[in-house]
Design a protein with these regions (language model features):
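Active-site catalytic microenvironments in core metabolic enzymes, especially phosphate/sugar-handling
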Residues: 1-156
Length: 156
């Protein structure tokens, strides 16, 4: 993420700000619309402070994770609806949330960006390229490589 952020617009999603309304979907969507031609990155920034102490901490953390996943899934869906042709999604839970939101019935599997991380084309949507990556692994240039392998420039 750090390397990609150096050359592309990026926007941090803050769990506690999403939960308490200090960060809105509309603000995030406006960022996407402004930078959509530059392949913007949305990423979870984590918590800047403990969300809550004590017994409620685990439940609050689950709410925070769910808020991040829902928001990123909605951004992905809306981006595709507005004409985006490629999505690169990192994080196991986030990838799952995005895949469920998009609802594709299957994928044609293409070349691998990294071991176990293929470029996929949804069945019935040959103009769309998707990469789902789980876990904190991969080379520092993963996002650049995935971007180069998706979309018109990635066609062979």
């Amino acid at each position: 993420i750090l390397r990609y952020r150096q050359e592309h617009p990026s926007c941090a999603l803050w769990a506690e700000k999403l939960l308490d309304g200090r960060q809105s979907y509309e603000e995030l969507w406006a960022f996407y619309q402004k930078y959509q031609e530059q392949a913007p990155l949305f990423y979870s920034a984590g918590a800047s402070e403990p969300l809550m102490q004590g017994e409620e901490e685990s439940r609050r953390d689950r709410w925070a994770a769910a808020a991040l996943e829902r928001t990123l899934a909605r951004l992905a869906q809306d981006a595709l609806t507005q004409g985006a042709r490629r999505l690169i999604v990192a994080g196991g839970e986030t990838s799952g949330a995005v895949a469920r939101q998009l609802g594709f019935e299957g994928y044609r599997i293409g070349d691998s960006v990294a071991p176990g991380v293929p470029v996929m084309v949804p069945l019935g949507s040959p103009q769309v390229w998707v990469v789902y990556k789980s876990g904190n692994f991969g080379e520092a240039d993963f996002f650049e490589k995935a971007l180069a392998m998706t979309g018109p420039a990635g066609e062979k």
